[in-house]
Regions:
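Short, solvent-exposed loop/turn elements at domain surfaces
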Residues: 47-52, 221-222, 287-289
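Active-site-proximal helix/loop segments of hydrolytic enzymes
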Residues: 24-38, 60-63, 67-259
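Residue-level detector of conserved, well-ordered beta-strand and adjacent loop positions
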Residues: 14, 41, 141, 214, ...
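Short glycine-rich His-centered loop
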Residues: 35-62
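Sec-dependent N-terminal signal peptides of Gram-positive bacterial secreted proteins and lipoproteins
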Residues: 3-24
Length: 317
């Protein structure tokens, strides 16, 4: 089927190339594969319908996890966008939240990342040990890799980089990467033990590297004083996260005034039919929406580059 479709597209492409507009394809084709799409998920917060989950709360200072991780998320988005070829989406960008952030449900957060064709989902949190003041420091909740080991490897690598950067701020990261299996025997479709944490588990099922960054303990007065007590300190945490992510993907800072040009259709930027699809779009043979995905309104597109089919069946690359 792929060979037949490729032959058909080649015929259409040959005709389309006679149009000068097709030359624009060459300007973006080489860059498309270099783009990184990241979804940030500030944990807890509003559900988009008036409900709210504050997350963990520090009894002495009154700091609420949901508020602090939102600030970290906004700072992190800002910092990541100083790098070339990075697009950042957020499950929520305010305290009210969205339909993707319902209370006590996390699947929708992963669904959102999948809809954005994300290469990485980073869920931002602060830990809590209740009244135990001796517990402090950061860790990352990663995957056991029982369903999609390739995605798990990405989590391990990005997570290790982030922890190294948080450690430079003075945060105790000795707990490292934590991989916790299901407590009740829940398994993945392949019969292997599933991950315990929903963000990580649903990420595995959607073939998206998804991790939870517990930056430090909001229940710890010491951690609050050292790392959470000002916007400058929250920004420093966000910048540490960004450096860790950038190190894994090999990101480079933009030059002053530099403007990125995103791929036409983010869901097929690494697909074998990408160049065909871009050319057909430029020449008017194929119509669609450039952000974030094409609209499957043409037989060519549905056959060549259907994101929902490709993303649901293909592991991380």
């Amino acid at each position: 089927m792929k060979r037949i479709l490729s032959f058909f597209l080649t015929l259409v492409l040959t005709a389309a190339l006679l149009c000068p507009a097709a030359l624009a394809v060459n300007e973006t084709a080489a860059k498309d594969r270099d783009w990184v799409y990241i979804t940030l998920d500030p944990g807890h917060g509003g559900d988009g319908a008036g409900g709210n989950d504050s997350g963990a709360v520090n009894e002495k200072y009154g700091y609420q996890e949901a508020d602090l991780v939102l600030k970290i998320g906004l700072y992190l988005k800002e910092e990541l966008e100083t790098y070339r070829n990075v697009h950042v989406d957020m499950t929520r960008s305010d305290s009210y939240g969205t339909r993707y952030t319902p209370l006590r449900e996390v699947k929708q957060r992963v669904d959102f990342a999948a809809e954005q064709c994300s290469d990485l989902l980073v869920s931002l949190h602060l830990n809590s040990a209740g009244s135990n003041q001796s517990v402090h420091g950061g860790l990352i909740l990663a995957s056991n890799g029982n369903y999609d080991p390739d995605c798990a490897k990405v989590i391990d690598a990005v997570g290790t980089n982030i922890l190294a950067q948080l450690s430079r701020l003075g945060i105790d990261t000795s707990r490292g990467l934590v991989k916790e299996g299901s407590h009740d025997g829940t398994t993945y479709p392949n019969g292997k033990l599933a991950d315990y944490y929903g963000i990580v588990r649903y990420g595995q099922l959607r073939h998206i590297p998804a991790m939870i960054v517990e930056h430090c303990f909001v229940s710890s007065n010491s951690d609050c004083e050292q790392f959470l007590s000002s916007d400058a300190k929250l920004r420093a945490i966000a910048q540490a996260d960004a450096r860790g992510i950038a190190a894994y993907y090999g990101l480079e800072k933009k030059d002053p005034g530099e403007v990125d040009v995103e791929p036409l259709f983010r869901d097929c930027r690494s697909h074998w039919a990408k160049d065909y699809v871009n050319t057909l779009y430029f020449t008017g043979v194929l119509t669609g929406s450039a952000a974030p995905r094409t609209r499957a309104g043409s037989t060519v597109w549905e056959a060549a580059c259907s994101s929902r089919t490709a993303r649901s069946r293909a592991p991380c690359s």
